């Protein structure tokens, strides 16, 4: 089978990821579980020769690993991670949705559109790898593109969803191709007149510091972070800095954070996967706790903040059960 046929078959079976290696049979991931795939994988090294441009080939030969995205004719766009190991070369492929979903399809908490109306501040989308953070960010961009007149600048590694400017002017930059690092791209973005900056990932303290500065200086910053809960995300941001910097960082977060939306995927009754959400909103009480370093109390704030639009994973699960999804 060629890759177009493999992707078509994978879509038919609700597969989220493909794992290809010349040293063993192909595997795919369905509803979070790894299974042996019912096809023979094409030669991985040949695929990379076909898919990578000259600059990517150089990075691949130099570093032995590469993240990129590829569009296959007539099928889905794929996010790819190629890497070498003891047995040879492997490709991990994530099948991206056919189109950018909207917030109503994902069924994010009802207050999310109001949060996106903020003129500035930081909105974090967090969760484990493969839980749909990029899809949620894409839905947020899609919402703004339909409802606001903004300049949106994205910094991604790699570019996953391709946007068409509608009401918004959307410009997408890929790390390694259009700028060297997230920090370098973000530093440049502050001179490029964006209203909204999308950061594919907050990877280090320099990027976090620049994101907070951007959020404080009149930009709405949307970013992802690898944590399993909303409260843990705040702790992770603060802990990225040395002790002497934690207090000013907490002060910045207390004033610039708008919300943390954490998510995870569960298998639903339709043999698919459904997103559950946890939402922390930066109310005055939340900001005071962050400023004072009482981060351990944030989980309680979420549990008691339903009236302000907050949501726990348990409340989200109850909502899904009422819909008949769980």
Predicted feature descriptions by range:
Residues 1-326:
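Short, flexible helix-loop junctions that flank or precede catalytic/ligand sites
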């Amino acid at each position: 089978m060629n890759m177009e046929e493999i992707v078509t078959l994978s879509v038919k079976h609700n597969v989220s990821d493909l794992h290809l290696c010349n040293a063993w049979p192909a595997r795919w991931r369905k509803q979070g579980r790894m299974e042996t795939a019912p096809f023979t994988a094409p030669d991985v090294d040949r695929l990379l020769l076909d898919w990578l441009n000259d600059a990517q080939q150089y990075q691949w030969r130099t570093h032995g690993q590469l993240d990129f995205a590829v569009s296959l004719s007539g099928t889905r766009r794929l996010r790819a991670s190629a890497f070498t190991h003891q047995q040879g070369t492997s490709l991990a492929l994530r099948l991206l949705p056919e189109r950018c979903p909207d917030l109503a399809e994902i069924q994010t908490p009802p207050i999310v559109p109001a949060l996106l109306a903020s003129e500035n501040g930081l909105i974090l989308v967090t969760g484990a790898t493969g839980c749909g953070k990029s899809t949620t960010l894409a839905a947020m961009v899609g919402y703004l593109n339909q409802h606001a007149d903004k300049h949106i600048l994205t910094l991604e590694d790699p570019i996953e969803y391709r946007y068409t400017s509608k009401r918004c002017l959307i410009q997408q930059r890929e790390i390694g191709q259009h700028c060297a690092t997230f920090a370098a791209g973000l530093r440049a973005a502050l001179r490029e007149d964006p209203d909204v900056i999308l950061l594919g990932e907050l990877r280090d303290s320099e990027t976090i510091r620049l994101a907070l500065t951007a959020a404080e200086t009149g930009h709405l910053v949307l970013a992802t972070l690898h944590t399993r809960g909303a409260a843990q995300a705040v702790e992770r941001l603060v802990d990225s800095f040395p002790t002497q910097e934690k207090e000013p960082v907490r002060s910045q977060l207390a004033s610039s954070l708008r919300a943390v939306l954490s998510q995870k995927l569960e298998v639903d009754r339709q043999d698919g996967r459904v997103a559950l959400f946890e939402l922390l909103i930066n109310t005055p009480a939340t900001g005071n706790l962050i400023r004072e370093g009482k981060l351990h109390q944030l989980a309680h704030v979420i549990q008691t903040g339903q009236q302000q639009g907050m949501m726990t994973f348990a409340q989200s699960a109850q909502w899904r059960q009422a819909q008949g999804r769980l």
